[in-house]
């Protein structure tokens, strides 16, 4: 349903933000 879609979008966005943050912290961007 719509709620599941929103949850998946939020999870995906969270993963992308975590990846960007971790690559900046490690200097590997």
From Swiss-Prot:
It holds the Pfam family Antimicrobial_2. GO terms for cellular component: extracellular region. Disulfide bonds join 23-29. InterPro entries: Antimicrobial_frog_2 (IPR012521). Keywords: Amphibian defense peptide, Antibiotic, Antimicrobial, Cytolysis, Disulfide bond, Hemolysis, Secreted. Expressed by the skin glands. It is found in: Secreted. The keyword Secreted applies. Its main location: secreted. One of its GO terms (biological process) is defense response to bacterium. Belongs to the frog skin active peptide (FSAP) family. Brevinin subfamily. Shows antibacterial activity against representative Gram-negative and Gram-positive bacterial species, and hemolytic activity. This is Brevinin-2Ed. It comes from Pelophylax lessonae (Pool frog). The lineage of its organism: Eukaryota, Metazoa, Chordata, Craniata, Vertebrata.
